[in-house]
Protein backbone atom coordinates (compact mmCIF):
# COMPACT_ATOMS: atom_id res chain seq x y z
CA UNK A 1 0.00 0.00 0.00
CA UNK A 2 1.08 3.58 -0.69
CA UNK A 3 0.45 6.15 2.05
CA UNK A 4 -0.45 9.48 0.46
CA UNK A 5 -0.80 12.86 2.17
CA UNK A 6 -3.08 15.25 0.28
CA UNK A 7 -3.18 18.73 1.77
CA UNK A 8 -6.06 21.14 1.24
CA UNK A 9 -8.28 18.31 0.02
CA UNK A 10 -11.46 19.47 1.74
CA UNK A 11 -11.65 22.16 -0.91
CA UNK A 12 -12.90 22.04 -4.49
CA UNK A 13 -10.21 20.45 -6.65
CA UNK A 14 -8.65 18.49 -3.80
CA UNK A 15 -11.87 16.74 -2.79
CA UNK A 16 -12.54 15.75 -6.39
CA UNK A 17 -8.98 14.46 -6.65
CA UNK A 18 -9.27 12.34 -3.48
CA UNK A 19 -12.42 10.71 -4.83
CA UNK A 20 -10.79 10.14 -8.22
CA UNK A 21 -7.66 8.55 -6.76
CA UNK A 22 -9.40 6.26 -4.26
CA UNK A 23 -11.55 4.92 -7.08
CA UNK A 24 -8.55 4.44 -9.37
CA UNK A 25 -5.85 3.23 -6.98
CA UNK A 26 -6.90 0.37 -4.71
CA UNK A 27 -3.40 0.43 -3.21
CA UNK A 28 -3.61 4.05 -1.97
CA UNK A 29 -4.28 4.99 1.64
CA UNK A 30 -5.04 8.72 1.74
CA UNK A 31 -4.64 11.13 4.62
CA UNK A 32 -6.38 14.45 3.99
CA UNK A 33 -4.80 17.31 5.93
CA UNK A 34 -6.83 20.52 5.80
CA UNK A 35 -7.10 23.67 7.88
CA UNK A 36 -10.84 23.93 7.16
CA UNK A 37 -10.87 27.63 6.37
CA UNK A 38 -14.05 29.13 4.93
CA UNK A 39 -13.61 27.20 1.64
CA UNK A 40 -12.75 23.88 3.29
CA UNK A 41 -15.85 21.77 3.76
CA UNK A 42 -16.06 18.21 5.06
CA UNK A 43 -19.40 17.87 3.26
CA UNK A 44 -17.26 17.70 0.10
CA UNK A 45 -15.81 14.42 1.38
CA UNK A 46 -18.84 12.93 3.12
CA UNK A 47 -19.38 10.23 0.50
CA UNK A 48 -15.65 9.46 0.47
CA UNK A 49 -15.64 8.79 4.20
CA UNK A 50 -18.64 6.51 3.82
CA UNK A 51 -17.34 4.57 0.80
CA UNK A 52 -13.60 4.45 1.45
CA UNK A 53 -13.40 4.77 5.24
CA UNK A 54 -10.77 2.05 5.53
CA UNK A 55 -8.40 3.86 3.15
CA UNK A 56 -9.28 7.45 4.02
CA UNK A 57 -8.43 9.52 7.07
CA UNK A 58 -8.98 13.20 7.81
CA UNK A 59 -6.73 15.38 9.96
CA UNK A 60 -7.35 19.06 10.61
CA UNK A 61 -4.24 21.20 10.56
CA UNK A 62 -2.32 24.10 9.04
CA UNK A 63 0.50 23.37 6.58
CA UNK A 64 2.39 26.30 8.11
CA UNK A 65 2.51 24.41 11.44
CA UNK A 66 5.85 22.62 11.21
CA UNK A 67 5.37 20.40 14.26
CA UNK A 68 1.93 19.23 13.16
CA UNK A 69 3.02 18.58 9.57
CA UNK A 70 6.11 16.63 10.60
CA UNK A 71 4.05 14.59 13.05
CA UNK A 72 1.45 13.80 10.40
CA UNK A 73 4.06 12.66 7.87
CA UNK A 74 5.98 10.57 10.39
CA UNK A 75 3.00 8.97 12.15
CA UNK A 76 1.32 7.95 8.90
CA UNK A 77 4.42 6.68 7.12
CA UNK A 78 3.78 8.99 4.19
CA UNK A 79 5.33 8.05 0.83
CA UNK A 80 3.82 10.76 -1.38
CA UNK A 81 2.81 14.37 -0.64
CA UNK A 82 0.40 16.20 -2.95
CA UNK A 83 -0.06 19.85 -2.02
CA UNK A 84 -3.44 21.36 -2.88
CA UNK A 85 -3.46 23.61 0.20
CA UNK A 86 -3.65 27.24 -0.86
CA UNK A 87 -5.43 30.49 -0.39
CA UNK A 88 -6.65 30.79 -3.94
CA UNK A 89 -9.10 33.62 -4.58
CA UNK A 90 -7.59 36.65 -6.31
CA UNK A 91 -10.12 39.09 -4.86
CA UNK A 92 -9.37 38.01 -1.29
CA UNK A 93 -5.63 38.26 -1.97
CA UNK A 94 -6.09 41.97 -2.68
CA UNK A 95 -7.40 42.56 0.84
CA UNK A 96 -5.60 39.80 2.80
CA UNK A 97 -2.22 39.26 1.07
CA UNK A 98 -0.45 38.15 4.23
CA UNK A 99 -2.48 34.97 4.58
CA UNK A 100 -1.64 34.03 0.99
CA UNK A 101 2.08 34.41 1.63
CA UNK A 102 1.84 32.36 4.82
CA UNK A 103 -0.01 29.45 3.19
CA UNK A 104 1.20 29.46 -0.40
CA UNK A 105 4.87 30.22 0.25
CA UNK A 106 5.73 29.44 3.87
CA UNK A 107 3.34 26.48 4.06
CA UNK A 108 4.87 25.01 0.92
CA UNK A 109 8.32 25.43 2.48
CA UNK A 110 7.21 23.50 5.58
CA UNK A 111 5.90 20.64 3.43
CA UNK A 112 9.14 20.56 1.45
CA UNK A 113 11.10 20.39 4.69
CA UNK A 114 8.97 17.41 5.73
CA UNK A 115 9.56 15.75 2.37
CA UNK A 116 13.29 16.30 2.80
CA UNK A 117 13.38 15.11 6.42
CA UNK A 118 11.46 11.89 5.81
CA UNK A 119 12.81 11.04 2.33
CA UNK A 120 9.44 11.24 0.62
CA UNK A 121 9.36 9.41 -2.73
CA UNK A 122 7.54 12.25 -4.51
CA UNK A 123 6.37 15.76 -3.70
CA UNK A 124 3.79 17.11 -6.11
CA UNK A 125 2.86 20.78 -6.12
CA UNK A 126 -0.51 21.94 -7.43
CA UNK A 127 -0.11 25.36 -9.02
CA UNK A 128 -1.89 27.67 -11.44
CA UNK A 129 -1.47 29.16 -14.88
CA UNK A 130 -1.89 32.57 -13.26
CA UNK A 131 1.79 32.51 -12.28
CA UNK A 132 2.60 33.36 -15.92
CA UNK A 133 0.51 36.52 -15.92
CA UNK A 134 -1.52 37.51 -18.93
CA UNK A 135 -0.34 36.91 -22.47
CA UNK A 136 -1.30 38.55 -25.74
CA UNK A 137 -3.00 36.50 -28.45
CA UNK A 138 -2.09 34.28 -30.16
CA UNK A 139 0.68 33.39 -27.69
CA UNK A 140 0.44 30.57 -25.15
CA UNK A 141 2.42 30.24 -21.94
CA UNK A 142 4.86 27.34 -21.79
CA UNK A 143 6.48 25.78 -18.76
CA UNK A 144 9.75 27.56 -19.63
CA UNK A 145 8.25 31.06 -19.55
CA UNK A 146 9.20 33.54 -16.87
CA UNK A 147 6.76 33.99 -14.00
CA UNK A 148 4.86 37.28 -13.85
CA UNK A 149 2.29 36.95 -11.09
CA UNK A 150 0.20 40.11 -11.11
CA UNK A 151 -1.86 39.58 -7.93
CA UNK A 152 -0.77 38.62 -4.41
CA UNK A 153 -2.37 35.22 -5.10
CA UNK A 154 -0.45 34.46 -8.28
CA UNK A 155 2.76 35.93 -6.86
CA UNK A 156 2.50 33.73 -3.77
CA UNK A 157 1.86 30.63 -5.90
CA UNK A 158 4.87 31.55 -8.04
CA UNK A 159 6.92 31.81 -4.85
CA UNK A 160 5.80 28.35 -3.80
CA UNK A 161 6.69 26.93 -7.21
CA UNK A 162 10.15 28.46 -7.11
CA UNK A 163 10.70 27.05 -3.63
CA UNK A 164 9.77 23.58 -4.94
CA UNK A 165 12.22 23.84 -7.83
CA UNK A 166 14.91 25.17 -5.49
CA UNK A 167 14.47 22.18 -3.16
CA UNK A 168 14.62 19.85 -6.14
CA UNK A 169 17.94 21.34 -7.23
CA UNK A 170 19.53 22.10 -3.86
CA UNK A 171 18.39 19.11 -1.82
CA UNK A 172 17.31 16.55 -4.45
CA UNK A 173 13.73 16.54 -3.22
CA UNK A 174 11.77 14.60 -5.89
CA UNK A 175 9.43 17.36 -7.05
CA UNK A 176 6.91 17.68 -9.86
CA UNK A 177 4.57 20.63 -10.48
CA UNK A 178 1.35 20.99 -12.43
CA UNK A 179 -0.08 24.39 -13.37
CA UNK A 180 -3.78 24.16 -14.02
CA UNK A 181 -6.16 26.56 -15.70
CA UNK A 182 -9.55 27.61 -14.29
CA UNK A 183 -11.47 24.56 -13.05
CA UNK A 184 -15.23 24.11 -13.02
CA UNK A 185 -17.33 21.29 -11.63
CA UNK A 186 -18.87 19.94 -8.39
CA UNK A 187 -18.13 21.38 -4.95
CA UNK A 188 -16.59 24.70 -6.03
CA UNK A 189 -17.05 27.33 -3.33
CA UNK A 190 -19.43 30.02 -4.64
CA UNK A 191 -16.98 32.91 -4.62
CA UNK A 192 -15.44 31.85 -7.95
CA UNK A 193 -17.10 33.15 -11.08
CA UNK A 194 -18.91 30.03 -12.32
CA UNK A 195 -20.61 28.98 -9.07
CA UNK A 196 -21.40 32.62 -8.25
CA UNK A 197 -23.08 33.13 -11.59
CA UNK A 198 -24.82 29.76 -11.68
CA UNK A 199 -26.28 30.01 -8.19
CA UNK A 200 -27.23 33.68 -8.64
CA UNK A 201 -28.91 32.90 -11.96
CA UNK A 202 -30.88 30.04 -10.41
CA UNK A 203 -32.29 32.58 -7.92
CA UNK A 204 -32.80 35.30 -10.54
CA UNK A 205 -30.11 37.49 -8.99
CA UNK A 206 -27.58 39.68 -10.86
CA UNK A 207 -24.40 38.19 -12.30
CA UNK A 208 -21.63 40.68 -11.34
CA UNK A 209 -19.19 41.01 -14.25
CA UNK A 210 -15.89 42.85 -14.06
CA UNK A 211 -15.36 45.55 -16.68
CA UNK A 212 -16.18 44.76 -20.30
CA UNK A 213 -16.31 40.98 -19.77
CA UNK A 214 -13.81 40.34 -22.53
CA UNK A 215 -11.22 38.72 -20.28
CA UNK A 216 -10.18 35.35 -21.75
CA UNK A 217 -9.86 32.21 -19.64
CA UNK A 218 -9.28 28.50 -20.22
CA UNK A 219 -12.01 26.62 -18.33
CA UNK A 220 -11.43 22.90 -17.78
CA UNK A 221 -13.58 20.27 -16.10
CA UNK A 222 -12.19 19.41 -12.69
CA UNK A 223 -11.96 15.65 -13.35
CA UNK A 224 -9.89 16.30 -16.48
CA UNK A 225 -7.50 18.23 -14.27
CA UNK A 226 -7.47 15.41 -11.71
CA UNK A 227 -6.58 12.91 -14.42
CA UNK A 228 -3.79 15.18 -15.65
CA UNK A 229 -2.31 15.45 -12.16
CA UNK A 230 -2.45 11.68 -11.77
CA UNK A 231 -0.65 11.14 -15.08
CA UNK A 232 2.11 13.59 -14.13
CA UNK A 233 2.59 11.93 -10.74
CA UNK A 234 2.89 8.53 -12.42
CA UNK A 235 4.88 9.49 -15.52
CA UNK A 236 6.25 13.01 -15.11
CA UNK A 237 9.98 13.64 -14.91
CA UNK A 238 11.34 14.82 -11.57
CA UNK A 239 12.09 18.53 -11.38
CA UNK A 240 9.69 19.31 -14.22
CA UNK A 241 6.59 21.48 -14.61
CA UNK A 242 3.51 20.51 -16.65
CA UNK A 243 0.65 22.75 -17.80
CA UNK A 244 -2.82 21.19 -17.50
CA UNK A 245 -5.73 22.84 -19.32
CA UNK A 246 -8.40 22.37 -21.96
CA UNK A 247 -6.76 24.64 -24.52
CA UNK A 248 -10.18 26.25 -25.13
CA UNK A 249 -10.41 30.00 -24.54
CA UNK A 250 -13.69 31.60 -23.47
CA UNK A 251 -14.52 35.25 -22.83
CA UNK A 252 -16.25 35.97 -19.54
CA UNK A 253 -19.19 37.58 -21.35
CA UNK A 254 -19.64 34.40 -23.40
CA UNK A 255 -19.42 32.31 -20.24
CA UNK A 256 -22.21 34.37 -18.68
CA UNK A 257 -24.35 33.99 -21.80
CA UNK A 258 -23.79 30.22 -21.84
CA UNK A 259 -24.82 29.87 -18.18
CA UNK A 260 -27.94 31.96 -18.69
CA UNK A 261 -28.85 29.98 -21.80
CA UNK A 262 -28.55 26.67 -19.93
CA UNK A 263 -30.81 27.98 -17.16
CA UNK A 264 -33.25 29.75 -19.46
CA UNK A 265 -32.56 33.13 -17.86
CA UNK A 266 -32.36 36.58 -19.54
CA UNK A 267 -29.07 38.29 -20.36
CA UNK A 268 -30.40 41.32 -18.48
CA UNK A 269 -29.23 39.61 -15.27
CA UNK A 270 -25.64 40.51 -16.22
CA UNK A 271 -24.53 43.44 -14.07
CA UNK A 272 -21.38 45.32 -15.08
CA UNK A 273 -19.22 46.41 -12.15
CA UNK A 274 -15.90 48.24 -11.83
CA UNK A 275 -12.99 46.05 -12.84
CA UNK A 276 -10.63 44.27 -10.46
CA UNK A 277 -7.29 46.09 -9.89
CA UNK A 278 -4.59 44.65 -12.16
CA UNK A 279 -7.06 42.26 -13.79
CA UNK A 280 -5.26 40.02 -16.29
CA UNK A 281 -6.87 40.12 -19.72
CA UNK A 282 -5.95 36.73 -21.12
CA UNK A 283 -4.56 33.43 -19.85
CA UNK A 284 -3.65 30.75 -22.36
CA UNK A 285 -1.32 27.80 -21.93
CA UNK A 286 0.44 25.27 -24.11
CA UNK A 287 -0.52 21.83 -22.75
CA UNK A 288 1.54 19.79 -25.23
CA UNK A 289 4.06 18.66 -22.60
CA UNK A 290 1.32 16.95 -20.57
CA UNK A 291 -0.15 15.47 -23.74
CA UNK A 292 3.21 13.85 -24.46
CA UNK A 293 2.68 11.80 -21.28
CA UNK A 294 -0.56 10.43 -22.72
CA UNK A 295 -3.02 12.83 -21.08
CA UNK A 296 -5.67 14.77 -22.93
CA UNK A 297 -8.75 16.71 -21.78
CA UNK A 298 -11.94 14.65 -21.86
CA UNK A 299 -14.56 17.41 -22.01
CA UNK A 300 -15.35 20.26 -24.34
CA UNK A 301 -16.22 23.59 -22.74
CA UNK A 302 -19.92 23.02 -23.45
CA UNK A 303 -19.85 19.56 -21.87
CA UNK A 304 -17.96 20.78 -18.80
CA UNK A 305 -20.30 23.71 -18.25
CA UNK A 306 -23.46 21.63 -18.75
CA UNK A 307 -22.29 19.07 -16.17
CA UNK A 308 -21.39 21.86 -13.76
CA UNK A 309 -24.71 23.67 -14.06
CA UNK A 310 -26.61 20.40 -13.67
CA UNK A 311 -24.67 19.58 -10.49
CA UNK A 312 -25.59 22.90 -8.88
CA UNK A 313 -29.23 22.41 -9.86
CA UNK A 314 -29.24 18.96 -8.28
CA UNK A 315 -27.31 19.94 -5.14
CA UNK A 316 -28.98 23.11 -3.93
CA UNK A 317 -28.76 22.06 -0.29
CA UNK A 318 -24.96 22.06 -0.55
CA UNK A 319 -24.57 25.61 -1.83
CA UNK A 320 -27.51 27.19 -0.03
CA UNK A 321 -25.95 26.14 3.26
CA UNK A 322 -22.77 27.99 2.24
CA UNK A 323 -24.43 31.14 0.86
CA UNK A 324 -25.37 32.47 4.27
CA UNK A 325 -23.64 34.07 7.25
CA UNK A 326 -20.02 34.98 6.54
CA UNK A 327 -20.51 34.47 2.83
CA UNK A 328 -23.26 37.10 2.62
CA UNK A 329 -21.08 39.62 4.44
CA UNK A 330 -18.18 38.92 2.07
CA UNK A 331 -20.40 39.12 -1.02
CA UNK A 332 -21.81 42.49 0.03
CA UNK A 333 -18.35 43.84 0.79
CA UNK A 334 -17.00 42.59 -2.53
CA UNK A 335 -19.75 43.75 -4.90
CA UNK A 336 -21.95 46.40 -3.27
CA UNK A 337 -21.74 49.88 -4.79
CA UNK A 338 -19.58 48.82 -7.77
CA UNK A 339 -22.28 48.89 -10.41
CA UNK A 340 -21.49 50.87 -13.56
Which role does the model predict for each range below?
Residues 41, 186, 246:
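Short, conserved catalytic or interaction motifs in soluble domains
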Residues 134-136, 186-188, 192, 289:
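Short beta-loop-alpha junction of Rossmann-like oxidoreductase domains
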Residues 48, 139, 190-198:
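A glycine/serine/threonine-rich, flexible loop-to-helix segment
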Residues 1-183, 307, 315, 321-340:
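N-terminal Rossmann-like NAD(P)+-binding domain of SDR-like oxidoreductases, especially those catalyzing
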Residues 149-156, 186, 190-194, 218-222:
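The catalytic Tyr-centered alpha-helix of NAD(P)H-dependent dehydrogenases
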Residues 39, 66, 187, 191, ...:
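Loop/helix-junction capping segments adjacent to catalytic residues or to phosphate/diphosphate-binding pockets
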Residues 61, 195, 201-340:
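C-terminal substrate-binding subdomain of Rossmann-fold SDR/epimerase-dehydratase oxidoreductases
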Residues 159, 163, 167, 197, ...:
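Hydrophobic alpha-helix immediately C-terminal to the catalytic Tyr-X-X-X-Lys motif of short-chain
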Amino acid sequence: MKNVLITGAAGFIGSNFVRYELEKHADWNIVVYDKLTYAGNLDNLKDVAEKFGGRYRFMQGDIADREAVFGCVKDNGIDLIINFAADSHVDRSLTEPGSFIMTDVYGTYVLLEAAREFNIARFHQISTDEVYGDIEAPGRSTEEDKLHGSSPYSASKAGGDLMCLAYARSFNVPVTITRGTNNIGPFQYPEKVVPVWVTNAIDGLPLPMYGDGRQMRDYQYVLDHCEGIDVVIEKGALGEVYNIGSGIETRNIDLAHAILDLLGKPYSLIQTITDRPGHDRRYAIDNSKARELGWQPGHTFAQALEKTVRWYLENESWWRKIKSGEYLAYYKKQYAGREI
